[in-house]
Amino acid sequence: MHLSLDTMNMVDDSCLSPGNFPEMVKGGMAAIGNRVHSIDVILGFTKDQGPTLLNPGANTLTVPQKVEVESLGQLGKQDHPTHPYGQLPLRDSSEQPAFHGTLDTEIFSNKCESELGEVRKVSDSDRKSPEQGDEEQPKKKHRRNRTTFTTYQLHELERAFEKSHYPDVYSREELAMKVNLPEVRVQVWFQNRRAKWRRQEKMDASAVKLHDSPMLSFNRPPMHTNVGPMSNSLPLDPWLTSPLTSTTPVHSIPGFMGPSQGLQAGYPGHGFLNTPQSMGQSMQPMAPPPYQCPAVFTDKYPLEDTNQRSSSIASLRMKAKEHIQSMDKTWQPM
């Protein structure tokens, strides 16, 4: 059940020189009579892994494979520092015993076989991404130049738009040949022009609605509807008050006097002062317009000025009569 001294010495030597693993296995097998269960117990191997111990070099990787695994592992570490297997060191047979290297390489190869394809895909995509970006950049930069219309072209297009807002294909083709433009450009111009026309129509409609909306009415005191004889007193707005007091009766104002009281007998009266009584009564059911000032006539001159004016008119008439009489006397026959 115990190993011989030769076997232990060979195990110690194998720890120092892993290349002597086959000789160590052969010596141990010869010494213990092909009984390797103690080593299996120490290393934790099962009976199914016995052939692996007997033939340790069967599943080991070759030198090119090791180089490829190391290079891919370095790429995975550089490209993906958070890779779950990126921190696993690659073991070599020169650092540890051969059986440890065999098991570690088997585990690492089995676990990384599924990851190698992903690493290769990532590396290929990283290599191809700059080229694809260079190919996609010209596509993004490619943009159609804006069409600059001349004055003649715009004039012809506007004339055609006045005739019809929706010209057919034949009309557009004829117009395109006339103005030396592609038919597609003409079609796009008509689309833009119709959109502009619709916006203008909406603006005009909104302006008309604002213009037709009722204006705000002024808050005025209620007015009496009985516009009868001129002697009736009418309520005056505070901003229309005359220098006279509001308690002054209307018939005392010179403007509301009758034609016989305010004028002399020889001076003809005006028509608006000779309004009959029946006409004033017929105006009773009529109401004044909503935005019209009340019919209140205020004289600009005081009462003294009116008296002086009437007296001056009378004196002028007297002077005229005297002058006519004097002229008649001078033209009498001698």
UniProtKB/Swiss-Prot annotation:
> Under the GO molecular function aspect, what terms does this record hold?
DNA-binding transcription factor activity, RNA polymerase II-specific; RNA polymerase II cis-regulatory region sequence-specific DNA binding
What segment(s) does the record annotate as region Disordered?
Answer: 76-97, 118-147
- Locate the DNA-binding region by residue range: 142-201
As annotated in the record, motif Nuclear localization signal runs over 317-321
Location in the cell:
Nucleus
| Name of one Pfam family that matches | Homeodomain
Gene3D superfamilies on file: Homeodomain-like
Q: Mark out the compositionally biased spans (Basic and acidic residues).
A: 118-131
Looking at the record's lineage, which domain of life comes first?
Eukaryota
Please indicate the residue ranges that the annotation assigns to the motif Octapeptide motif: 37-44
GO CC, alphabetical: nucleus
For this protein, the record's PANTHER family field holds: HOMEOBOX PROTEIN, PUTATIVE-RELATED, RETINA AND ANTERIOR NEURAL FOLD HOMEOBOX PROTEIN 2
Family affiliation: Belongs to the paired homeobox family. Bicoid subfamily.
Function, as annotated: Plays a critical role in eye formation by regulating the initial specification of retinal cells and/or their subsequent proliferation.
Descriptive protein name? Retinal homeobox protein Rx1
- Naturally occurring in which organism (per UniProt): Psalidodon fasciatus (Banded astyanax)
